[in-house]
Swiss-Prot record:
Assembly with partners or alone: Homodimer.
Active site feature: 147, 149, 154
Role this protein plays: Could be a virulence factor.
Keywords: Hydrolase, Lipid degradation, Lipid metabolism, Secreted, Signal, Virulence
Catalytic activity, EC: 3.1.4.4
Annotated PROSITE patterns: PLD
GO CC term, one of those recorded: extracellular region
GO biological process, alphabetically ordered: lipid catabolic process; phosphorus metabolic process
CDD domains per the UniProt record, alphabetical: PLDc_Nuc
Protein name: Phospholipase D
Keyword DNA-binding: no
Family, similarity comment: Belongs to the phospholipase D family.
Keyword presence, Heme: no
Length: 205
């Protein structure tokens, strides 16, 4: 009886494994076809990338929170701007960064900003304060969220990372900021900025 039970168990396990393998193979075949099909073609997608090896001659700086201090790091870079600042932001509620941007605009620096639509309703967003300072602010109309955190300064510096331009990012969260001084990289980020600008809406109040 024991040998029959063992045989039955062995056959059952083999049967289950066979079904599982069949499902796996079929699923792999199915998703491979989807990826290769015209409806989900990766070969036709235009992908802009930048090889990290090309950054070997670039000046790269980093900042991390905690401890606090990355807001000051960003403000210092904005204060050094001479010609232009192009910015993309999800959260935009930090007073120090906002003041630095307004001061840059007042001293003749071209300041252009794209924000996520959530800033239209966020209580602490600086959107309207920036608008009142005559800064060109647009709302990125991407179907999801505009989650970029990017500042391009004088077409040669890129500030990016996980850091939202908010007090929480500096005082409460674990975040990172990276500053890369590289004209080619800045050009790549500018191309993306302008591509998002073409699908953005102006803010009226």
């Amino acid at each position: 009886m024991k040998s029959k039970n063992n045989k039955f168990i062995a056959v059952s396990i083999s049967f289950i494994l066979g079904i599982a393998l069949g499902i796996y193979v079929e699923s792999t075949y199915y998703f491979t076809n989807i990826i290769n099909s015209k409806s989900f073609s990766l070969s036709n997608a235009q992908i802009n990338y930048y090889s990290i090896s090309e950054l070997s001659r670039s000046n790269v700086s980093t900042c991390f929170t905690p401890p606090a201090g990355c807001t000051k790091f960003i403000v210092q870079q904005i204060e050094k701007a001479e010609e232009s600042i192009y910015m993309q932001a999800y959260g935009m509620s930090d007073s120090l960064i906002t003041t630095a941007l307004i001061n840059a605009q007042m001293r003749g620096v071209k300041v252009r900003i794209l924000l996520d639509r959530s800033n239209l309703k966020q209580k602490f967003s600086k959107l309207y304060e920036l608008q009142q300072a005559k800064i060109d602010v647009g709302i990125d109309t991407v179907p999801g969220i505009a989650h970029n955190k990017v500042i391009i300064i004088d077409k040669k510096k890129v500030i990016t990372g996980s850091f939202n331009f908010t007090v929480s990012a500096d005082k409460r969260n674990a975040e990172n900021v990276i500053l890369i001084e590289d004209r080619k990289l800045a050009e790549s980020y500018l191309q993306n900025w302008f591509s998002r600008k073409t699908t953005s809406n102006a803010v009226h109040f």
